[in-house]
């Protein structure tokens, strides 16, 4: 065990392991999962981490191949405002009716349908230099039929015992009514009211917990090497003859 610790200290394996873990986490296809109910709006991403001047592209697909320029057709692009101009938002192609709104580093889906893509990808590009590595988001849909209010239980039981054709037909058409998918006539800035989406914030916190753990490990490593704790332990073991052996195979006692 002591030889293993000595080998780790001498070759800085602990520091390299932390760097390797950060690289794998950064370039892995780890998607932030966002839970949303079918028919509700949802906001992906957050305004944190956005640097002024960045152009943000959103794709309704996985991030695989985005960096290589393969099949990269953004559904929404946030173009930061130029000095003296108002902000601009482009959707390519322009959907009808409007389904997406992007602002800074967030994408607001105004109405989530069952047929919508599950994977979304965000890529930030500074005015000069290379674009950042894309970030992946995954939608986890909850069906409306799986959740019922407590006051609806009596009505549902009554429908089972005394069926009413008119009521059942009304329920059926209500579930498939095209009005559920009507998003026209929405006020400007509609998506801004959903930036406080609770599920999105929970997902953001869960994804950032891995980075917090890595930062804590780095701080511990810096403290250890700043106070020269590994070197002191090594010198202490050297005086006790734990690290080196003489020609006879026994620990030295110099």
UniProtKB/Swiss-Prot annotation:
Keyword list, A-Z: Host membrane, Membrane, Transmembrane, Transmembrane helix
Main location, first listed in the record: host cell
Compartments reported by the entry: Host membrane
Region (Disordered): 163-182
Membrane topology: Single-pass membrane protein
Signal peptide range: none
Domain of life the protein comes from: Viruses
Membrane-spanning ranges: 207-227
Keyword ATP-binding included in the entry's annotation: no
Biased composition (Basic residues): 166-176
GO cellular-component term (any): membrane
UniProt similarity note: Belongs to the RL11 family.
Record's protein name: Uncharacterized protein UL10
Source organism: Human cytomegalovirus (strain Merlin) (HHV-5)
Phylogenetic lineage: Viruses, Duplodnaviria, Heunggongvirae, Peploviricota, Herviviricetes
Gene encoding the protein: UL10
């Amino acid at each position: 065990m002591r030889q293993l610790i000595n080998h780790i200290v001498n070759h800085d394996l602990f520091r390299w392991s932390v760097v390797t873990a950060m690289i794998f986490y950064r370039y892995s296809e780890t998607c932030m999962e966002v839970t949303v109910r079918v028919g509700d709006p949802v906001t992906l991403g957050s305004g944190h981490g956005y640097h002024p001047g960045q152009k943000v592209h959103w794709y309704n697909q996985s991030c695989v191949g985005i960096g290589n320029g393969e099949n990269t057709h953004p559904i929404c692009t946030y173009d930061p405002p130029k000095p003296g101009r108002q902000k601009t938002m482009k959707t390519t192609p322009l959907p009808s009716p409007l389904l997406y709104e992007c602002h800074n580093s967030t994408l607001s889906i105004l109405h989530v349908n069952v047929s919508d893509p599950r994977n979304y990808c965000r890529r930030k590009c500074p005015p000069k230099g290379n674009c950042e590595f894309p970030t992946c988001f995954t939608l986890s849909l909850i069906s409306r039929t799986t959740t019922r209010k407590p006051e609806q239980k009596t009505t549902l039981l009554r429908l089972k015992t005394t069926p009413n054709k008119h009521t059942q037909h009304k329920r059926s058409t209500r579930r498939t009514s095209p009005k559920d998918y009507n998003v026209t006539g929405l006020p400007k800035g509609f998506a801004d009211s959903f930036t406080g989406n609770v599920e999105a914030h929970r997902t953001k916190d869960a994804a950032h917990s891995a980075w917090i753990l890595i930062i804590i490990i780095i701080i511990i490593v810096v403290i250890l090497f700043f106070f020269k704790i590994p070197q002191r332990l090594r010198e202490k073991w050297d005086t006790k003859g734990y690290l080196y052996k003489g020609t006879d195979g026994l620990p030295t006692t110099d």
